[in-house]
Amino acid sequence: MKDKFELVSKYSPQGDQPRAIEQLVAGLKKGLKHQTLLGATGTGKTFTVSNVIQEVNKPTLVMAHNKTLAGQLYSEFKEFFPNNAVEYFVSYYDYYQPEAYVPQSDTYIEKDASINDEIDKLRHSATAALFERRDVIIIASVSCIYGLGSPIEYGEMLVSLRVGMEISRDQLLRKLVDIQYDRNDIDFQRGRFRVRGDVVEIFPASRDEHCMRIEFFGDEIERIREVDALTGEIIGEREHVSIFPASHFVTRPDIMKKAIVNIKAELEDRLKVLRADNKLLEAQRLEQRTNYDLEMMEEMGYCSGIENYSRHLSLRPAGVTPYTLLDYFPDDFQMVIDESHVTMPQIRGMFNGDQARKQMLVDHGFRLPSALDNRPLRLEEFEKHINQIMFISATPGPYELEKNPDVIEQIIRPTGLLDPIVEIRPIQGQIDDLMDEINDRVEKNERVLITTLTKKMSEDLTNYLKEAGVKVQYLHSEVKTLERIEIIRDLRLGVYDVIVGINLLREGIDLPEVSLVAILDADKEGFLRSERSLIQTMGRAARNENGRVIMYADKMTDSMRNSIGETERRRKIQIEYNEKHGITPKTIKKEIRGIIAATSAADEREAVKQHDLSKMSKKERDVFIEGMEHEMKEAAKALDFERAAELRDALLEIKAEG
C-alpha cells in the first residue's frame, strides 16, 4: 500500500511560509484539534498546506465552498503531488432541480437532474482510493456532507480477483450484477462488462480509458490484463485487481430483503396516520409511489430516488447520522477548510434548507418520513467526524476563532507585494475626485475597481463615467457567467479601464492590473461593508505594486477602523521583511488566461456570437450544441473543470434562450 506523500515543486517555502508550516505541523503532531491559518491574499496558502500534508503524511480532505474553487484547488494539488492520489469529489449534477411540492398551487416538481459522467467517475475514483491507499488527498465541495451509501457495504461488496483464484465465469458475472454492473457486449463503457467465451472484460466505475480483461481456464482465473478499452492495446499484466461497486448505494441481497420488509412496515404505519387525518389523496399517492419503488427494488435491486430509502438500506434507526464521504476516511485523517469564513456557515446552513423542502414532500404523501434521514450532516454531527482540522482564510470567521483563538499568520507574500495604502475621503465631491483618480490610472495603463451599495448607484455611475469618455463596464448579479468572465478578461486586456459592481468579492477578481479599489459609501454598516468584506475587497488591490484603496465616507465606522488597522498592521510587517531581505515589490505578471480559464471561456463565447443561433436551422443548432457538449466533456476529461463549468453554463444559457 502506497503511503508516502511526495511534494514536487521547483519552489521552496519563502517569507512567512516556513514559520506557518512549522507551527501547523507542530500543532498537528501535538494533537491540536483545531488550527487556523490567517493567510493574506497571494501569500501561497495552498503551497503551505501542501508542505504540511507532506510532513504529517495523513489522508487529507480539503473542502471548498463551490465547484469552481474546488476545481482550482484540485489542479494545484495535482501539480504538487503528481505521484499521489489527488481526487475530486463534488456534486455530479450539471443541472439539479430537487424534488419539491408547493401546496399553495398544488404543484409537484419532480426531481430533474443531468449527471456529469466524468465527475461521477471521479467520485468513484475518490472512494476507491481511500480503500486502496493512504496517500490520498480529496478535494471536495460542501456536498461531501450529504448522505452517501454505507462504506461498510461498499467495502464488503468489492470483487477481489487474483490470478489462480478459483471462481467460475458465471459466479463472477453474478457478483458483477450484484454490485450494479450492467452487461453490454456492444456499448462498452464505465460500470459495464462484456463476455466473449472464457474472457470477461470489466470497465471499472472509477475509470474511463482502461478496462480489466479476466481470462479463465475452466473455473480458475488464468490471467488478468489491463487493456485500453478503445484500442484493445495491452497496458500491462496484473496479479490482483479490486472491482468496486458501480453505485455508492449498493446493497447486499440479504440486506435488501430486510430493507424492503422495513419499508413496507413504515408504509403501513404512515398510511394509517394519513387516513386517520382524513388525508385520503395523500395516502393513495404515497401507497402508489412507494409500491412502485418497492417493485423496482425487488426486481432490479434499485429504483429511481433510491437514496430516499438510504436509512432502511443501511438498517439505521430513525434520526441516526447518515453515512457520508467522511465515513470512508480512516480515523486518523485530517481536514482542511478553505475560505473557512464562507465554507463553515454553508456547512451550518445545509441541514435546515434540506429538511424544510423534504418535510413538505412527507406531509403531502410524496415520500415516507424516512426520506428525512437522507440528508446532509448537522454541524454537531460534522464536528464529531473531526479528528484534526485546519481552517484557511484571509479573514477567519467567528466559528474558527471560537475553536482556537491562537491564529497562525501568513502575511508576507513571496513576491514582496504589500497590502494597499488605504485613504478615507469625504463623500461630497466623490465623483469628481474619483474621475481624477481614474484618469491618473488610465495614463499609467492601470485598472480600477469601484464598489457601490446599490444597483441604481452602479448603473448611474456607469452611465456618468461612459458619458465622460471612460471605458467602463458594470458587473452585476444578472450578468451571465460567461459575460462576467469576458468582462473581467477585457478589463485585463484594456478593453475597459474600470469595472463598477456591488459585490466584487467573488473568486476570479484577483487582477494584477488593478491598482485602485474605490469603496463608495464605506461608512454604511452591513454585509458588504463589514470588517471581513472590507478586508477582502481591499485585497483586490494587493496584486499591484502601486495598490491603493480609497474609502469615501463621512464618518469612521468600527468595521472601517478595524479593517484599516488590520491592513496597516500587515503592511508594516511586510515592509519590515522586505527591508531586512532587500526585496523590491514587483507586480505579478499573470497570463491573461489565469482568471477561471477566462480566455477559453471568452473564446467559446465568441464562437457562440459568430454562429448566430437565431439564424440557424434546428439541425444546425443541434449540431452546434452537440459540438459544445463534446468540448465540455473533453475539458472535464482533461481535468480542466473550470473550463468545463463555463461551457456548461454557456450551454444552459443557449438552451434557455430556446
UniProtKB/Swiss-Prot annotation:
Q: Taking every annotated instance into account, which residue ranges of this chain make up the domain Helicase C-terminal? A: 430-592
Name all Helicase ATP-binding domain ranges. Answer: 26-414
Q: Which GO terms describe its biological process?
A: nucleotide-excision repair, DNA damage recognition; SOS response
Where is it mainly found?
A: cytoplasm
Spell out the subcellular localization from the entry: Cytoplasm
A GO term from the CC aspect: excinuclease repair complex
**Xref: CDD domains:** DEXHc_UvrB, SF2_C_UvrB
Query: Which residues of the sequence carry a binding annotation for ATP?
Result: 39-46
Which intervals hold domain UVR?
Answer: 622-658
UniProtKB keywords: ATP-binding, Cytoplasm, DNA damage, DNA excision, DNA repair, Excision nuclease, Nucleotide-binding, SOS response
Locate the motif Beta-hairpin: 92-115
One Gene Ontology MF term: excinuclease ABC activity
Q: Name one Pfam family in it.
A: UvrB_inter
| SUPFAM superfamilies, alphabetized | C-terminal UvrC-binding domain of UvrB, P-loop containing nucleoside triphosphate hydrolases
Q: How does it assemble?
A: Forms a heterotetramer with UvrA during the search for lesions. Interacts with UvrC in an incision complex.
Q: What is known of its domains?
A: The beta-hairpin motif is involved in DNA binding.
- State the family it belongs to: Belongs to the UvrB family.
Q: What does this protein do?
A: The UvrABC repair system catalyzes the recognition and processing of DNA lesions. A damage recognition complex composed of 2 UvrA and 2 UvrB subunits scans DNA for abnormalities. Upon binding of the UvrA(2)B(2) complex to a putative damaged site, the DNA wraps around one UvrB monomer. DNA wrap is dependent on ATP binding by UvrB and probably causes local melting of the DNA helix, facilitating insertion of UvrB beta-hairpin between the DNA strands. Then UvrB probes one DNA strand for the presence of a lesion.
Q: Which NCBIfam families match?
A: PRK05298.1, uvrb
User: Any idea what this protein is called?
Assistant: UvrABC system protein B
What gene is it encoded by? Answer: uvrB
